[in-house]
From Swiss-Prot:
Position of the signal peptide: 1-22
Statement: the UniProt record of this protein carries the keyword Signal: yes
Top-level taxon of the source organism: Eukaryota
Record's protein name: Protein suex-1
Amino acid sequence: MQSLLVFCLATIILSNFTEASADLETASQSLKHPRNLGWKAPEGHREKRYGGWGGGYPYGGYGGYGGGYGGGYGGGYGGGYGGRYGGNYGSSSWGSYSSYSSGGYSSYNSGFW
């Protein structure tokens, strides 16, 4: 009798975890899921920057962490942690997701920052 009760409880718990993981998998495949909002730019993987013109390869030209005009940790024209002309945590006039400025890609602010 006890083993039957343990078996039933284990079955219920496992079925709940299976349903929950299926829901998470469906949500993570959605195009609106925050993890899927990034895209790959031709010059390299586009990363979430901290404001400014950023984008492209880190430490090169524009962007990177603290390089050029592109934000980063405490530098540039846009945002960053204590950036000069932008806000905090990526809130600048160009949006939180910044991209390569000379490549014709516009900045994108998803509203998550």
